[in-house]
């Protein structure tokens, strides 16, 4: 949980974008995410430099000798016009390459069509200065800070997306009691709220008494020290998220990284479509122990592109019915799911509704 001072800093940063002419909440969060990532890369580079110097070893740098001007610690000191030019013409293209670090490469996957929407030099300077003062080196705090930023997404998008309230997400995760050796998926992940909460649930549940510490305002922090045996699985194979909104994918990847999942498996994919089974045959059926979801229930649907395994069981264009059918396909034998659906799924009287309820029984 972040304190009032940090909330005030985030609010001020948000207002700066709005007064600077960027008023779409998703765009604001996306642009802040880009800047946060630029700073995180530089912080990681500085940490690796110090560790290598102390151990008298070498490491593969993110920024080569000819790329030092692209580091946050260098471009943040430029004048407004120069900063905008360097960020727009050099830093952003650099993000779109495949840099040496896993962190840069992972986020770079979602940068192909990314654009710097900040056109006013004064706005960029203000945003950079504010982000430079945020505590991005503090484990729990940086994740909570991003969660607070995401809480500003309160309205539905054009695809029927909206952010599930945090307390609902937490309830659903606690009901399913995911274990650290299991696999967890969200087929319409949005900002990855369910996956992040699963990670936090594991941190809370698998922390010894000695691994809990309390800060000055009484907030408990959980080290997850009892998860060490599962750390490799958690980092590389436990979580899978899918969405077909590229902006959401960027935000989801950043959200996961800030909450301790260094290599988030977040993929651009419409999970109802034919291409899902073609691209990810090992993930598209009988693949997961736990599926958590709040899939979109509005928006357009190309019925011709929906996979036959779904349409064959529930002949409908209603996405809420198709997603439930999909989730049943995704689950392993004995798997479990918590999914938010409209009440019509349980009480509708169409043939598709009845067929789905028979499957659920």
Residue ranges and their predicted role:
Residues 303, 323-324:
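A short, conserved alpha-helix within the catalytic core of class I
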Residues 161-290, 298-300, 317, 321, ...:
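Conserved S-adenosyl-L-methionine
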Residues 331-337:
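Short glycine-dipeptide loop
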Residues 231, 304-312:
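Short glycine/proline- and charge-enriched loop/turn segments
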Residues 1-180, 253, 265-274:
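Non-catalytic, mostly N-terminal accessory regions of nucleic-acid modification and defense proteins
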Residues 39-45, 153, 192, 202, ...:
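A generic secondary-structure signal for well-formed alpha-helical elements
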